[in-house]
């Protein structure tokens, strides 16, 4: 994508966009679903603002909503007004989506001719989806899960219980949804806001999207049923299915597990996965990932154990082709020309400074190992001790034992 021809009318004349930003803007003008995965410092925010304003100027969109982390709400508004002083921007304040003012704010979104509507991450989930649209979506998800159970009757008990739990969760939402949306202040719902573009900053915050799988013994598949991710999935699918645009921004698209690649594909190219018969994780993993048994240090730091993880991609050219259809990935090394340069690291890599252990730390690690064994054997109540508590205290101990006992001497 070559955006060198873009002139960006209406932008602050003091701003000079870099070549990679113009290229990204041109891609956002051409495609409806894009993950902008540029490294930190490459100007993703300004690129996104310029793309929205250019789409609006060309009549390609009517109204865009930008979802940002709470602490960045005002920063986004200020940068947008700096770049486009004449932009019509509606920015949600701390109380605009409270129960008392939500109806008024939704009315302002729906009836105003806004270029950009900026809402904080915590408030986005308060924008209600209409009963009919939500019921259709939830019933569809329930049917998919039930079909998965039927087609995989040989799955392990743990995996089956997890899927049954998700079904009950969706059924509970179906039962409660009607009464929740009878409030007169929420009569304006997501479908009525007039949005045809949704742009999400720090998109990695929505990676915990539930998917059914038989791989209950594979470590690293943190398959939690995140309400925040599911809400984003519903609204993004509605935007896409109605011809709108969906854009995610993040410097860390994949952080913990290969399964996050599948989640990104569900968000940004679901229709492609449907055509390929890969909407479920297990056939996707069979095609693109390989489970490997590897020795790993135990979470409590008391020894090693063998874990099975999806640690290797296979059929990489085919997967790369699919990802390139929506993912705009860029590293500093690719743009370090002219005035865009990052200082080099000493010896071209981070330096590891080793510190000697202490008797107190070694004793505490041994204690953590005993606690972890008790948790795995089920001899201790989760309310009293659990792996999350053990790993959290282990990190504190590794940093400084005084975080656990302030009476200890300094190292």
Where are these regions (language model features)?
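Pre-Walker A (Motif I) flank of P-loop NTPase domains
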Residues: 31-36, 62, 115, 244-245
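Conserved Walker A/P-loop ATP-binding site and its immediately adjacent core
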Residues: 47, 60-89, 96, 122-123, ...
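Glycine-rich, phosphate-binding/catalytic loops in enzymes
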Residues: 53-54, 81-84, 133-137, 214-222, ...
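Inter-lobe coupling linker of SF2 helicases/translocases
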Residues: 102-149, 158-161, 165-197, 205, ...
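Conserved pre-motif I regulatory segment
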Residues: 2-37
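Walker A/P-loop
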Residues: 32-51
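Residues at the beta-strand->loop junction immediately N-terminal to the Walker
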Residues: 37, 67, 250
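Post-Walker A helix-loop "phosphate-sensing" segment adjacent to the P-loop in P-loop NTPases
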Residues: 55-61, 268-273
């Amino acid at each position: 994508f070559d955006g060198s021809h873009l002139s960006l009318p209406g932008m602050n004349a003091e701003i000079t966009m870099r070549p990679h930003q113009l290229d990204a803007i041109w891609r956002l003008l051409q495609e409806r679903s894009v993950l902008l995965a540029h490294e930190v410092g490459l100007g993703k925010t300004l690129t996104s603002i310029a793309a929205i304003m250019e789409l609006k100027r060309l009549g390609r969109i009517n109204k865009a909503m930008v979802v940002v982390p709470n602490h960045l709400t005002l920063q986004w508004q200020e940068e947008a007004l700096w770049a486009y002083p004449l932009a019509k921007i509606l920015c949600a304040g701390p109380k605009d989506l409270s129960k008392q003012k939500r109806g008024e704010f939704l009315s302002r979104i729906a009836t105003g001719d806004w270029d950009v509507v900026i809402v904080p991450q915590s408030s986005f989930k308060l924008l209600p989806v209409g009963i009919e649209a939500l019921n259709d979506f939830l019933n569809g998800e329930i049917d998919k899960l039930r079909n998965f159970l039927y087609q995989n009757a040989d799955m392990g008990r743990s995996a089956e219980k997890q899927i049954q739990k998700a079904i009950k969760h969706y059924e509970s939402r179906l039962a409660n949804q009607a009464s929740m949306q009878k409030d007169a202040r929420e009569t304006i719902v997501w479908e009525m806001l007039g949005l045809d573009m949704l742009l999400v900053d720090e998109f990695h915050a929505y990676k915990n999207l539930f998917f059914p799988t038989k791989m209950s013994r594979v470590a690293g598949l943190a398959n939690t049923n995140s309400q925040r991710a599911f809400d984003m999935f519903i609204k993004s699918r509605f935007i896409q299915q109605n011809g709108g645009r969906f854009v995610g921004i993040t410097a860390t698209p994949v952080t913990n597990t290969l399964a996050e690649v599948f989640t990104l594909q569900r968000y940004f190219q679901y229709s492609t996965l449907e055509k390929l018969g890969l909407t479920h994780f297990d056939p996707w993993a069979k095609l693109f990932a390989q489970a490997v048994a590897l020795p790993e240090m135990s979470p409590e730091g008391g020894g090693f154990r063998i874990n099975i993880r999806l640690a290797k991609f296979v059929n990489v050219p085919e997967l790369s082709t699919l990802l390139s259809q929506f993912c705009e990935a860029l590293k500093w090394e690719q743009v370090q020309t002219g005035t865009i340069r990052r200082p080099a690291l000493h010896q071209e890599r981070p330096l590891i400074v080793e510190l000697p252990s202490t008797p107190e730390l070694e004793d505490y690690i041994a204690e953590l190992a005993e606690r972890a064994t008790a948790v795995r054997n089920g001899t201790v109540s989760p309310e009293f001790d659990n792996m999350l508590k053990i790993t959290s205290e282990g990190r504190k101990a590794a940093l400084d034992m005084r975080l656990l006992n302030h009476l200890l001497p300094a190292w």
